[in-house]
């Protein structure tokens, strides 16, 4: 029986959740991680429904996912999640990604903040949920991947393209969805980079600011090594008065291929 500290979400990798090579898509993987996190929180009284009643919402601040082998179509995957630590403004949530036979596909680390829906300011988790969280913390659970590092700002000459945030980018928090950023980032690479068994094996992503419907997202990419890249996404309003100096850094991330 699963302990009260952990929650497992089991899914089958259906054809429409795979890429052209029949691998589980990173977008579907990312959404499943978020769904597992919400299921864990909801079953313990601090899910989106609960915090929305307090005019608050959970937002993802950091996400690091490392995949040793990507599941393929028809595989059944168990995504298990637990809370490692709680701090004043953030909480650490980890994940394991395994097959039904115990095969380890990968792990993930994430950092979340609870913000006021109106002011967008982070709330004090220790005051709101400190005692409640105590029984759910599982720092003893193994998550054997290194924590993500920092990515420095990229130069303007690393610019690749601009895109406009559209209807399908926006989630219930009214901003561009965290997993949609991953989709846009992966589209910076041609399909040939994902052929012949090559795939992204690790992503470290920091969500730094919010962006909204019709914002212009500028994507920058820099090659660090043969299989390592850094990406930055900046945002600005879609009007003629916006300048480079008025752009906000939305996302910085590091990608590893193998």
Model-based region annotation:
Residues 157, 161-254:
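Acidic/His-leaning functional-site neighborhoods
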Residues 2-9, 64-146, 207, 211-213, ...:
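HotDog/MaoC-like acyl-thioester-processing domains
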């Amino acid at each position: 029986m699963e302990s009260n500290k952990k929650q497992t979400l089991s899914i089958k990798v259906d054809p429409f959740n795979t890429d052209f090579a029949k691998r589980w898509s990173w977008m579907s993987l990312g959404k499943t991680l978020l769904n597992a996190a919400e299921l864990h929180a909801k079953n313990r009284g601090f899910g989106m429904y609960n915090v929305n009643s307090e005019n608050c919402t959970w937002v993802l601040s950091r996400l690091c996912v490392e995949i040793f082998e990507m599941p393929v179509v028809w595989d059944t995957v168990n995504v298990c999640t637990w809370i490692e630590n709680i701090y004043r403004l953030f909480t650490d949530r980890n994940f394991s990604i395994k097959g039904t036979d115990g095969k380890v596909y990968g792990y993930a680390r994430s950092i979340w903040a609870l913000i006021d829906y109106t002011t967008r300011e982070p709330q004090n988790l220790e005051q709101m949920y400190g005692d409640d969280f105590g029984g759910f913390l599982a720092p003893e659970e193994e998550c054997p991947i290194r924590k993500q590092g920092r990515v420095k700002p990229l130069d303007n000459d690393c610019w690749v393209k601009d895109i406009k945030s559209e209807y399908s980018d926006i989630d219930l928090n009214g901003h561009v969805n965290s997993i949609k950023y991953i989709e846009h980032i992966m589209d910076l690479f041609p399909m040939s980079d994902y052929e012949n068994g090559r795939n992204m094996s690790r992503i470290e992503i920091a969500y730094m600011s919010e962006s909204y419907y019709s914002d212009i997202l500028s994507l920058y990419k820099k090659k660090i090594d043969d299989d390592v890249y850094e990406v930055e996404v900046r945002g600005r309003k879609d009007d003629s008065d916006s300048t480079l100096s008025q752009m906000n850094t939305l996302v910085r991330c590091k990608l590893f291929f193998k």
